């Protein structure tokens, strides 16, 4: 089987530019490993794959559009793959092969590791090899000047990564002729062009604060490999806002590539673009070569198991259209137009979706049409519902498989069906009428609390043994009775719910803690009110420490550990990407009353005799 491998391909990819890349190399998979990620973020899983050509091995990242190959157990250790599209990026001073397209060669089966592949040479070895080549013959064009191999040591300087496998479209001459996939973009490249469809365009937003005033807009861009957000400020608003039209395809070049602020956008990409003075944008002649939209649908039944404030995609049949209503914000006294519509799907559930502003006023879709929503927020007011954000998109009767299947189901049996609603989920123990019985951790797990259709409530005596230090808070709206996440608009913070901008957010806790007792350990979710009691600081104060005094922040986290409390908890089923699990949330805590605990133990001993 070794003769089928593209021997030496990884070395060529590591040291050459795209013009010298071997076409569609065949490699063997040595390992497939899921990267650690925050399961509550909603981001897709990422996988690291080590590939071998029998002489060398290289670390690679799998494009999220290929995740299904891992889930279906097709991409596994020992399998053989043929790369059809890839690029090379520099990440943390290492070259990483980004796999954007591949075919699993199932006919070759699965085998033990072929040969004894080694990591590619270190920087010094590569330089020595290149010097020998230069002495033997004229220098070959396209040799990478990067000082890092796929597994190289840290170097003093980092050069841009070589470009990926490319296509040459009939693009304007002033633009680069190399078409990069969106997922291949990184800050380490400066000559690229993407061909992407505008799936969402915001309105022009204005801000005024102590540092001045300005305006901005943003667009979501989509191609076959993924999505990315692009933002323009001030002069770039005047230059590009009217050019970019929602739904159209463009060639875009010469933007700045920045690390994405993921807490402020629902676009799943490590990077984001910023339009600059030299940015070039031209409309593509072929408007059909790029997909219209990319969805990751959650069924309406599963919406009840999704965390509040999560941003998801849904699809349903429009069953009811409510009238336009005007509401007044208590915080700003400003009026807002809204409209509630109802959609249903084949899981037997209905869901209220709230439209806002211009979308609500101009909505004229006929009932029984198919509506696909991308990036709507999950609410928990008067039962589970959904709400469109300024970044959300709505497609009517989209030409996708899910739409056709849903239409067929509704015409065949769904039209006369009765649909269920998700009931109101109370956020406090006092309003549930349930007894919070004292349990130890082993009893909570053995009794499978939270696995029934309704939440279970219990009391737990335990000690905090660990606090996750990542994502302990989020920027919230400072208006009374709002608490929604706000988004950085480049000098101000915008609340979608209040439709207002603020100079600064008010941070609120979202902490994950590990609590232990004599029978085991349990992970609990903690929100703002309880977080203040545990940390003895507000989330604003802790965020300031995290940004300005790392040692003080770490000391504060350490001091909050190994403290005993009585935790009042809720256990509820949570469906995350098709996997059922139980989420435990702390509703309130109490300091230990040792006198009362002693009496409790005495009563327990006496009852056991």
From Swiss-Prot:
Zinc finger (C4-type) residue numbers: 477-498
InterPro entries attached to this UniProt entry: Euk_RPA1_DBD_C, NA-bd_OB-fold, NA-bd_OB_tRNA, Rep_factor-A_C, Rep_factor-A_N, REPA_OB_2, Rfa1
GO biological process: DNA repair; DNA replication; double-strand break repair via homologous recombination; meiotic cell cycle; nuclear DNA replication; nucleotide-excision repair; telomere maintenance; telomere maintenance via telomerase
Subcellular location: Nucleus
Pfam family for this entry, one: Rep_fac-A_C
Bias-annotated ranges (Polar residues): 130-152
Protein function: As part of the replication protein A (RPA/RP-A), a single-stranded DNA-binding heterotrimeric complex, may play an essential role in DNA replication, recombination and repair. Binds and stabilizes single-stranded DNA intermediates, preventing complementary DNA reannealing and recruiting different proteins involved in DNA metabolism.
NCBIfam families: rpa1
Name by which UniProt lists this protein: Replication factor A protein 1
Naturally occurring in which organism (per UniProt): Schizosaccharomyces pombe (strain 972 / ATCC 24843) (Fission yeast)
Classification lineage: Eukaryota, Fungi, Dikarya, Ascomycota, Taphrinomycotina
């Amino acid at each position: 089987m070794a003769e089928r491998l593209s021997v030496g391909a990884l070395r060529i990819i590591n040291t050459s530019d795209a013009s010298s890349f071997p076409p569609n190399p065949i490699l063997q998979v040595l390992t497939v490993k899921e990267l650690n990620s925050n399961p509550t973020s909603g981001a897709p899983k990422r996988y690291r794959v080590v590939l071998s050509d029998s002489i060398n091995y290289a670390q690679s990242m799998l494009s999220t559009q290929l995740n299904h190959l891992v889930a279906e157990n097709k991409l596994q250790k020992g399998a053989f793959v043929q790369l059809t599209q890839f690029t090379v990026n520099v990440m943390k001073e290492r070259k990483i092969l980004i796999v954007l397209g591949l075919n699993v060669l199932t006919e070759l089966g699965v085998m033990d590791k072929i040969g004894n592949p080694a990591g590619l040479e270190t920087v010094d070895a590569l330089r020595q090899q290149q010097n020998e080549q230069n002495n033997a013959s004229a220098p070959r064009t396209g040799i990478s000047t990067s000082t890092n191999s796929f597994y190289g040591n840290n170097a003093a300087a980092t050069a841009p990564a070589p470009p990926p496998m490319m296509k040459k479209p009939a693009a304007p001459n002033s633009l680069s002729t190399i078409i990069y996939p969106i997922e291949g973009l990184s800050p380490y490249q400066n000559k690229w062009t993407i061909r992407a469809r505008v799936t969402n365009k915001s309105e022009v937003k204005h801000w005024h604060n102590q540092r001045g005033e300005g305006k901005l807009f943003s667009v979501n861009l989509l191609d076959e490999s993924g999505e990315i957000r692009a933002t323009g400020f001030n002069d770039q608003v005047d230059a590009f806002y009217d050019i970019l039209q929602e739904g159209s395809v463009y060639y875009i070049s010469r933007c700045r590539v920045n690390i994405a602020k993921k807490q402020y956008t629902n676009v799943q990409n490590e990077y984001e673009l910023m339009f600059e003075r030299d940015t070039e944008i031209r409309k593509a002649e072929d408007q059909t070569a790029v997909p219209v939209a990319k969805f990751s649908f959650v069924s309406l039944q599963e919406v009840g198991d999704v965390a509040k404030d999560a941003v998801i995609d849904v699809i349903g049949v429009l069953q009811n259209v409510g009238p336009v209503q005007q509401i007044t914000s208590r915080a700003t006294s400003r009026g807002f137009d809204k409209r509630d519509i109802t959609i249903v799907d084949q899981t037997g559930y209905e869901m209220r979706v709230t439209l806002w502003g211009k979308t609500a006023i101009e909505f004229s879709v006929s009932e029984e049409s198919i509506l696909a929503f991308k990036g709507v927020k999950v609410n928990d007011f008067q039962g589970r519902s959904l709400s469109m954000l300024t970044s959300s998109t709505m497609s009517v009767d989209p030409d996708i498989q899910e739409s056709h299947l849903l239409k067929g189901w509704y015409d065949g049996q769904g039209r006369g069906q009765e649909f269920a609603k998700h009931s109101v989920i109370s956020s406090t123990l006092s309003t549930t009428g349930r007894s919070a019985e004292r349990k130890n951790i082993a009893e909570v797990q053995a009794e499978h609390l939270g696995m029934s259709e309704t939440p279970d409530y219990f009391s737990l005596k335990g000690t905090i043994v660990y606090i996750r230090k990542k994502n302990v808070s989020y920027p919230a709206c400072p208006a009374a009775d709002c608490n929604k996440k706000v988004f950085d608009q480049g000098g101000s913070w915008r609340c979608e719910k209040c439709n207002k901008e603020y100079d600064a957010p008010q941070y609120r806790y979202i902490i994950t803690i590990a609590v232990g007792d004599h029978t085991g350990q349990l992970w609990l979710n903690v929100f703002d009110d309880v977080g203040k009691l545990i940390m003895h600081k507000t989330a604003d104060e802790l965020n300031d420490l995290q940004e300005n005094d790392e040692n003080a922040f770490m000391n504060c986290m350490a001091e909050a550990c190994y403290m005993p409390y009585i935790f009042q908890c809720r256990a509820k089923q949570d469906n995350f990407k098709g996997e059922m699990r139980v989420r435990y949330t702390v509703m309130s805590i109490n300091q230990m009353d040792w006198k009362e605990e002693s009496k409790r133990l005495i009563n327990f001993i006496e009852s056991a005799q």
